[in-house]
Amino acid sequence: MADGERSPLLLDGRDGMTGLSLGDEPYRPISKPQNFAVFPSAPPMLGEAPPPYSPLGSPESSSAPVISCRVCQSLISVEGKIHQHVVKCGVCNEATPIKNAPAGKKYVRCPCNCLLICKVTSQRIACPRPYCKRVINLGPVNPGAGSPNPQPTGARVSCGHCAKTFLWTEFTDRTLARCPHCRKVSSIGQRYPRKRSLICFLLCLIFVITTAGLIAGTWLKAQKYKGIYASWVFFIVLVLVTLVRALHWACMKISEPLHNYS
């Protein structure tokens, strides 16, 4: 068994140092190329989307997700970089998006391969690289099926003041709308103002009972201690404020929704 382990792995007719037989030509190393190929410039890519993840493994880990570089098509490992929007290629040093652009933004790639980010509504953008400084015309933004801006959703509302129609989209539990025509505030529906009016009336009733009890209980002492009158005034002011607020909500104009809009 030991003799078998010491036996040479190559045949006797080959040189032990070079692994070549006597009749083979001597090995000549391949000369290193003088210049590497320059990556070609690409036309501007408007609204560039991130490439899909490749099921192949990266050189560092056989299970790490990778994507293809949008410039040189090299594989880029995104392990530990999922939270980023773009990653940098280690071959061409250019950025490649791995996530969609933030809301209201889009990716644009300059012909010099620089990845830019701008507003969706932008029509012109300049490359920041000192040797490029190219101005890219993106053209007018036409809303269509592929537009990242969603169409407005909401309801058409008839103003309770001027009876004109306007679009309102912010529907919450406290829905107050300002008409763009008459600039007056009204409530969308009757539920919210009725609820507020009822609360203010109940507070007003509580303050009325409290004020009446305070005045009746301190009537004689107030003639001796003048500071008690200040507490009377305070509670009377609370009664008036809650009463005014209750009347305000009770008399608020109501704007009725006409139909849903999408």
Curated annotation (Swiss-Prot):
GO cellular component: late endosome membrane; lysosomal membrane; phagocytic vesicle membrane; plasma membrane
InterPro entries found in the cross-reference section: PtdIns-P2-Ptase
Protein topology in the membrane: Multi-pass membrane protein
Short sequence motif named CX5R motif, residue ranges: 118-124
Gene source species: Danio rerio (Zebrafish)
Role description: Catalyzes the hydrolysis of the 4-position phosphate of phosphatidylinositol 4,5-bisphosphate.
Pfam family, one: Tmemb_55A
Renumbered residue ranges of the record's region Disordered: 1-25
The protein's name: Type I phosphatidylinositol 4,5-bisphosphate 4-phosphatase-B
UniProt entry tagged with the keyword Transmembrane: yes
